[in-house]
Every structure is written in structure tokens, then in C-alpha cells.
């Protein structure tokens, strides 16, 4: 990691307002700022989405680093692909942004019920042909929406060839955003592939869980606890620096359906004000960077009072109040998840009431509702089919089953027992039959 610019250098940069300072963004498809770097620095192309001011004599660079402090100062290092290898084909798919239209979504000029899926692992593939194959199959099936991870946080640099998006270093108290070939360029390819096929992406920006680092990766580098993550000023400044890097990168892409603040945010034992205040602040920040795309919470939908049976998911035990969070001014639609087995619910038909409860809250708020994750381990059809029918009849805007699977060049995609593999008998009863009714 290069050292941060000196005070003298920063002062010199401030005197040249029309030029970009060291390691600053100087180009890219979504970029509208200055393109000229300060003396001694050159604007270097990473890919069609991102160019950065690098030392004029540098032949290789690395990832963009953000300090924990709210300062905009940053450092970087990472291998820069040549313009010929990093340039992606010009997308030819749909060109309109997804919008809310009453209690439904308008996608490519159509306001109706949509179906989709989750494939969290897609940006972590290193073979472009595998990404293309997944997108081709989704397009053939008629699955219009894909939710995939926009985060991958580590506390130490992984082995060569392993994809990661951010390195939170506990030894230095710094965070490095990886914009290289094993970093955000993998997400670049997913976005580009989705654009060409008219697939719309939902992208959460941090994980509540420790998979792929999550909030605890920040805590390990900056201290505090997971429940303090939402209010820790150092952590939030680093989180917002990452938001800015990703959201600005794809601000003009029609492939993005919406940004999600997190995947399944929880703050066990906290006042619901903690998550609400963070939701309101962060969603407003995203909208200030990107007015083109919608914003959602990405949460499980816990803390519902409408038709509550008093069970764990309806409670605010995890610090979340669904209606309260949905009411945040810059949240465009509601999302919720359904996992009866994981929540200790014995009767799968309970899920139908869970769906209709959320539909009622969304209707009262005047915002669409997305049945964002649902599934059963191994038994992929019995209850899921009923949940899907309830989703359609209750006025939901769309549903996304968890999760999509297929054979890749390296073998089967991840199987967490919820996975429904493309072309199998479970695919027919759990996915194709549902799509045929829409």
C-alpha cells in the first residue's frame, strides 16, 4: 500500500481545483468529474467503468485504499490491465432504469409481477464463460431479477486468484478497495453481462453474517462490536467510502435494479432506532450519489405487527421493525425473507401468513414489496409452490427464490441444500411451473 499523500502535497492539490489528486478517480462510464491529474500523475484506465490517477512513471498499480477517518484521502496499489484487455464490449441489452409503479415494478416499460433468483457467488467466479452461461440460462428461463453480492471483505490478503473486494487490515487500521482483476473487475463483468441480456441486479453492500467477511471484518480492523457497527463513526466512514466506490462505478448502468444497504441487517437487543437511523442516513447517502437507482434495506422483514402471532420472526428481538424501516424516505420498496426451518417454525404453511402480513404493510406504505429470499432445504417444491402462489395473489411485486445453481467449468455451483439446479426435476416444479403461471 502506498503511503497517504503528504500534507504539503494535499495543499498543492487543493490549489489546483480543476485537477484530480493522487489516486483519485479521473474517468469511467459513470464518471462526470475532472479528467486531468495533478502534475506527476497520469489518468490510467482500469476498465470501462473506472480510471484512476497513478504516478506518471508507474507501470503497475493496485487497489484504492480508504482510511478509517472521514477524510477523503486515499491510497492505492494494484496491477492495471492494459486498455485492450480491460475494455468490455458495449452492452446491447435494455437501457431503462427500473422504477416503482404503484405497488409493482416497471422494468423495460412493463409493469407486472416479476420472478427472479439469488446467486450470491456469481461475482466471485474468475471464468467469464461461466458468468455468461449463468446469465444466458436466466434469460432463457425468464428470470428477470438476480440478487448477488456486492461485498467480499477480508482481513488478510488471500491467495493469488481469489476474488476479494475490500481488505480491512487490523495491523494498520486501513481499508483497501480492490479494483483489480481479482476485485471489482469481476463485478464489472457481471454488470456488463447483465446489461447485454436485460437482467436486473439487486446488490447488497455489506453482510450481517461472517460469510465473505461481513460486518465483523470491519470490527476486526477498527474495534467495537457487531452491535456497535451501525453507530461506530470510523466504521461508517469506511463503509460509506466503499458505497461511494461501488455506487459511483455503476451509477449509469441500467443493469442495476437497486442497491441494498446490507444482507439481513440485525442488531440483537438494540432499540429499533439503531437500524432505522442507519437505514435513513445510508439510503439518503446512496441517493445523493446515484439518483438513477432504487434503494432497499436487504433485511429479513422481522418486527411486523400486522397479523402477528407473537413468534420470533414477528418480534423486534433482532432490532428490526419492518414498517418503520420501510417508512424511511429514501427506501423505495420493502423486502423480506422466509426460512421456516431456520426460524424454528414447524408448519410450512405459516409462511403464507408471513407473506400476506408484509403485503399489507407495503400496501399501507404505498410501496412495492419484494419476496426476496425463500426456500426449503432439499424439499424444494411442496411449500415453496404455495408461497409463490400466495406472493402473486397477495399483491407482491416479485419473488426471488434462494438460490440458483448450475454446472460450471469447475463443477456444480455452491449447494447449501436450498440450491435448485437449472434443468433438474426440482427446477421444473420449483421454478419453471411458477414462471409458466405468470
Curated annotation (Swiss-Prot):
A single GO cellular-component term on record: extracellular region
Biased composition regions of type Low complexity, renumbered to the chain: 61-86
pH dependence remark: Optimum pH is 4.0 to 5.0.
Protein's UniProt keywords contain Hydrolase: yes
Residues annotated as catalytic: 264, 373
Principal cellular location given in the protein's record: secreted
Domain of life: Eukaryota
A Pfam family reported for this protein in Swiss-Prot or TrEMBL: Cellulase
Region: Disordered, residue numbers: 61-92
Region (Ser-rich linker): 60-96
Enzyme class: hydrolase
Keyword Secreted in record: yes
Region (Catalytic): 97-438
Reactions mediated catalytically: Random hydrolysis of (1->4)-beta-D-mannosidic linkages in mannans, galactomannans and glucomannans
EC id: 3.2.1.78
All copies of domain CBM1, residue ranges: 19-54
GO biological process: mannan catabolic process
Function field: Endo-1,4-mannanase, a crucial enzyme for depolymerization of seed galactomannans and wood galactoglucomannans.
Written domain comment of the UniProt record: Has a modular structure: a carbohydrate-binding module (CBM) at the N-terminus, a linker rich in serines, and a C-terminal endo-1,4-mannanase catalytic module. The genes for catalytic modules and CBMs seem to have evolved separately and have been linked by gene fusion.
UniProt similarity note: Belongs to the glycosyl hydrolase 5 (cellulase A) family.
Protein name: Mannan endo-1,4-beta-mannosidase F
UniProt organism field: Aspergillus fumigatus (strain ATCC MYA-4609 / CBS 101355 / FGSC A1100 / Af293) (Neosartorya fumigata)
Taxonomic classification: Eukaryota, Fungi, Dikarya, Ascomycota, Pezizomycotina
Amino acid at each position: 500500500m502506498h503511503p497517504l499523500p503528504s500534507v504539503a502535497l494535499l495543499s498543492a492539490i487543493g490549489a489546483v481545483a480543476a485537477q484530480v489528486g493522487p489516486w483519485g478517480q479521473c474517468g469511467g462510464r459513470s464518471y462526470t468529474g475532472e479528467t486531468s491529474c495533478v502534475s506527476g500523475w497520469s489518468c490510467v484506465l482500469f476498465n470501462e467503468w473506472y480510471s484512476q490517477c497513478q504516478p506518471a512513471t508507474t507501470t503497475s498499480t493496485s487497489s484504492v485504499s480508504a482510511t478509517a477517518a472521514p477524510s477523503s484521502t486515499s491510497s492505492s496499489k494494484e496491477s492495471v490491465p492494459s486498455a485492450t484487455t480491460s475494455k468490455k464490449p458495449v452492452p446491447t441489452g435494455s437501457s431503462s432504469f427500473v422504477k416503482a409503479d404503484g405497488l409493482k415494478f416497471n422494468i423495460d416499460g412493463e409493469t407486472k409481477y416479476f420472478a427472479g433468483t439469488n446467486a450470491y457467488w456469481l461475482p466471485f467466479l474468475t471464468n467469464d464463460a461461466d458468468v455468461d452461461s449463468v446469465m444466458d440460462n436466466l434469460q432463457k428461463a425468464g428470470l428477470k431479477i438476480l440478487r448477488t453480492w456486492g461485498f467480499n471483505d477480508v482481513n488478510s490478503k488471500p491467495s493469488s486468484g481469489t476474488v476479494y473486494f475490500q481488505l480491512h487490515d487490523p495491523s494498520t487500521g486501513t481499508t483497501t478497495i480492490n479494483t483489480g482483476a481479482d476485485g471489482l473487475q469481476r463485478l464489472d463483468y457481471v454488470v456488463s453481462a447483465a446489461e447485454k441480456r436485460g437482467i436486473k441486479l439487486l446488490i447488497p453492500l455489506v453482510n450481517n453474517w461472517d460469510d465473505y467477511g461481513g460486518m465483523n471484518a470491519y470490527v476486526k480492523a477498527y474495534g467495537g462490536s457487531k452491535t456497535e457497527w451501525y453507530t461506530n463513526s470510523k466504521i461508517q466512514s469506511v463503509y460509506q467510502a466503499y458505497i461511494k466506490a461501488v455506487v459511483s462505478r455503476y451509477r449509469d448502468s441500467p443493469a442495476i435494479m437497486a442497491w441494498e444497504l446490507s444482507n439481513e441487517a440485525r442488531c440483537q437487543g438494540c432499540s429499533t432506532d439503531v437500524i432505522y437511523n442507519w437505514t435513513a442516513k445510508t439510503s439518503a447517502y446512496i441517493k445523493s450519489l446515484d439518483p438513477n437507482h432504487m434503494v432497499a434495506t436487504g433485511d429479513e422483514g422481522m418486527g411486523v405487527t400486522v397479523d402477528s402471532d407473537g413468534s420470533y420472526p414477528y418480534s423486534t428481538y433482532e432490532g428490526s421493525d419492518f414498517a418503520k424501516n420501510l417508512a424511511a424516505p429514501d427506501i423505495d420498496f420493502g423486502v423480506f425473507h422466509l426460512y421456516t426451518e431456520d426460524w424454528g417454525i414447524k408448519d410450512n404453511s405459516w409462511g403464507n401468513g408471513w407473506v400476506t402480513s408484509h403485503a399489507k404493510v407495503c400496501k399501507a406504505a404505498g410501496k412495492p414489496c419484494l419476496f426476496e429470499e425463500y426456500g426449503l432445504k432439499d424439499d424444494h417444491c411442496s411449500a415453496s409452490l404455495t408461497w409463490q402462489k400466495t406472493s402473486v395473489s397477495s399483491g407482491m411485486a416479485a419473488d426471488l427464490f434462494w438460490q440458483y445453481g448450475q454446472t460450471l467449468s469447475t463443477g456444480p455451483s455452491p449447494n447449501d441444500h436450498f440450491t435448485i439446479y437449472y434443468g433438474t426435476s426440482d427446477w421444473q416444479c420449483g421454478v419453471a411451473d411458477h414462471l409458466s403461471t405468470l
